[in-house]
Structure formats: structure tokens, C-alpha cells
Amino acid sequence: MRAAYASSINPDNPLAGLTVGDIDPHTPEEWATVHVRASALNHHDLWSLRGVGLGADRLPMVLGCDAAGVDEDGNEVVVHAVIGGSDGAAAEGVDETMDPGRTLLSEKYPGTLAERVRVPRHNLVPKPPELTFEEAACLPTAWLTAYRMLRVRGRLPDGGSVLVQGAGGGVATAAVVLGVAMGARVYATSRDPGKRERIAALGATAFEPGARLPERVDVVIEMVGAPTFDHSLKCAKQGGRIVVSGATAGYQAAVDLRRVYFLQLEILGSTMGTREELAALLSLCVSHGVRPVVDTVFGFSEVERAFARLESGDVFGKLVLDHSR
């Protein structure tokens, strides 16, 4: 089948290892097959091409974590990318993100940037008819991560407030949209004036990084890392929560522990989300009329262009692949 896959590892020039062509990857025969209609790119794909989380001994590896498509029974489905346990098994109601043996698609098992993807049947979530395949394909990684950060780890209260650091990328943009949909007062930072305008259009109040906010917030969504972490601590109210799911600009952050203990702040890690949380996210999108922010929809034949766009960093929202063209 035709797929976009990592054929080599290159930390300095990740796109040098991207190959588009025919491949016949091995997956467990008992898993469900999904004919992919749309997929979406994530920075995880670039990190894989750099060799982070993907060793040379696992090459070639089909890339991609996000997909929506049709299973062998004709059902329209969204693929949950977290594969739990040593054999991909996951029990109902179990938080598979806490499984020490968990992997994401494209780390141990072939990913979604292909004509077909196989996953445990547990990983299939019904796609609501209100969402297009392109919209649904945006949700399983970045949007699910943002949902868990806000609702589960951050425990965002009704009528609460949230700061999103470094808005513009997939997770941060999702956090802005979801925070607004949840009824929160949303503040977001970006160095780019154009992105600040687009953040404001989504319903948030935009600031330059490091700016003083009108209030201290219940929840801070932190993915930038070292350059913004002190600001995140200063912006959290007493008993507030700083939820971290990335450190794109540096992972060695200085922390004023006096602020942490005196204000009884919580610093919480968050990674992806469960199948049940993905189902809840889909329901929220339908009930609140929420739709993912899509930067560009490329045809699958343009996958190299899509990756180049992702690497450039000049993206606001998700990059989507339409597998019909």
C-alpha cells in the first residue's frame, strides 16, 4: 500500500528520511483495519524522523498518529492513537496513558499516513456524522491532548480562567478553542502579531509573551517550556494548576519553589488522552458546534509539501491530508 514512512533517521535534516511509496508493514492480523480517508500531521512525526522515540531498528516505519476513515464493516470511525499493553490490549475504563508499556502509533506499530491502518478494535471510536473526515482527523492527538489538559488534569472549573502559552500550534490552538467552548475566560500568548489577531478571533484575549494578565488564572497550559515557565507560575492563582505537555523551547526551567508552596500551586504532567476522553471530545465538538482550526488541507500526493510546512513552523492550527487525492 502507499504510505509516508521514515526510511532513515536524521536529527539535523529530518525530511531527508521521509519516503513516500509502497510498503507492506506487519501488524497483528486480529486487529481492525481502517481505510483512511483523512489524516493529520503532528510534531511527533518530525521528532520520529529525528529518531526521538523511534530507533533505526524499527525502520521503515509508517508515520502518523491521527486518522479518520471507514472500518471493514463500513463504520465511519476515528482512530485513537494510544496503543496500550504489550499486545495493544486495553481494558474498558483503564487509563492507557498511564500504562508503562504504552506506545503511540508510528513508534512500535505502523501509523496512519497510509491507505490503511490496523489498530486494536478498542481503539476505534465512532465518528459523529456532524464532523467531516478532515475535521475528525485533527482530534486524536493535539485536540485530545488539549482536552485532557483542560478538563482532566487541569480540572478547569465552570466559569474559570486559563492561560495558553505559545498559541498557534495544534495543541495550543485547540486549548484556546476548547477553553472558550467550556465557558472559560481564555488568555493566550504569542510572539507573532498575526497569530495574536487570529487568537483573538477565536475568542481569547491575546498578549505578548511575559505580559501581565488582568487576573491570575485557574489553569495554565504550558508547552513552551523554559522561556515561559516562570511567567506561567506568576500567572497562576492560589491553588492554581500549571499543566505541562511539552517543552518545545527548552526543558531545563528554573522554578521559584517559594511561589509553588506558598500559593499551593500544582505542576502537573499530561500526555495524550484515553479512548473515553476522545469520545467525550467528539461529543463536545458536536454539542457545542466546535470545529478544529485547520491551517491547510493537502492532498496525500502533497505529503512532502505538508511536512515542509510543518517543519517551517509557519502554521496556525492543523495540517490535514485528504487521502482521496
How would you label these PLM feature ranges?
Residues 26, 71-72, 206-214, 302:
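Short acidic low-complexity segments
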Residues 24-40, 52-93, 97, 101, ...:
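Glycine-rich beta-strand-centered segment in the early N-terminal region that forms part
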Residues 37-38, 72, 82-83, 122, ...:
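Short, surface-exposed secondary-structure boundary micro-motifs
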Residues 1, 275-325:
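C-terminal hydrophobic helical "lid"/dimerization subdomain
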Residues 81-166:
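NAD(P)H dinucleotide-binding glycine-rich loop of Rossmann-like/cofactor-binding domains
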Residues 185-187, 193, 197-266:
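Glycine-rich cofactor phosphate-binding loops and adjacent beta1-alpha1 units
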Residues 238-243, 254-296:
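Rossmann-fold dehydrogenase core element
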Residues 129, 135-210:
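Mid-domain Rossmann-like dinucleotide-binding core that forms the NAD(H)/NADP(H) cofactor-binding site
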